[in-house]
Swiss-Prot record:
Descriptive protein name: LYR motif-containing protein 9
Membrane-spanning segments: none
Coiled coil: none
Homology family: Belongs to the complex I LYR family. LYRM9 subfamily.
Listed Pfam families: Complex1_LYR
Disulfide bonds: none
InterPro entries, alphabetized: Complex1_LYR_dom (IPR008011), Complex1_LYR_LYRM9 (IPR045291), Complex_I_LYR (IPR052151)
Taxonomic lineage from the root: Eukaryota, Metazoa, Chordata, Craniata, Vertebrata
Listed PANTHER family: LYR MOTIF-CONTAINING PROTEIN 9
Length: 78
C-alpha cells in the first residue's frame, strides 16, 4: 500500500524527493513534518552522487516503503 497516490509513478530521484515532501504534509504536527522533511533532504544529499540505476531503484523502493510505514505509524497513534 502506497502512502499517497502516484507512488508507482516515481522513477527518478527528483520525483522521489518531491513525493516524499508531499508525504510529509500528511503528518500530524508541524514539528514532526519538519523532522521528516529534514531527513528527506539529508538522504537526498547523501545519495546525490549515486549513478547506478539498479541502486537508485532500490533506494526509491525502500524510501516509498519507509514513507508508508511512517504514515501508518502516525495514523495508528491518532
Amino acid at each position: 500500500m502506497a502512502p499517497l497516490p502516484g507512488a508507482e509513478l516515481v522513477q527518478t530521484p527528483l520525483q522521489l524527493y518531491r513525493y516524499l515532501l508531499r508525504c510529509c504534509r500528511q503528518l500530524p504536527t508541524k514539528g514532526i513534518q519538519e523532522h521528516y522533511k529534514h531527513a528527506v533532504r539529508q538522504s537526498f544529499r547523501v545519495h546525490s552522487d549515486e549513478d547506478n540505476p539498479e541502486r537508485i531503484q532500490q533506494i526509491i523502493k525502500r524510501a516509498i516503503e519507509d514513507a508508508d510505514w511512517i504514515l501508518n505509524k502516525y495514523k495508528k497513534q491518532n
